[in-house]
Amino acid sequence: MKLLYFAWLRQKIGKAEETLDPPASVATVAELIAWLKTRGPGYADALKNPKLVRVAVNREYVQGDFKLKPGDEVGLFPPVTGG
């Protein structure tokens, strides 16, 4: 699974992208975020409030209950605001 991090998520996690193989118990977006938070302090800080993180799977916005598949591309980024 390819993960892409944008804006302040990228800064806190310390990388723009990575390829990971989550455990079989990670089936949904919410479970992926919970698992990522266990990968270190940068992840835990960036993902501490999931309401501040938008997720796109294969370039489509999804909710936390969205079922993931091997090979998905998952983008995590802050909500877009207007000005």
Give the positions of each predicted feature.
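Ubiquitin-like/PB1-type beta-grasp interaction modules and other compact soluble beta-rich domains
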Residues: 1-82
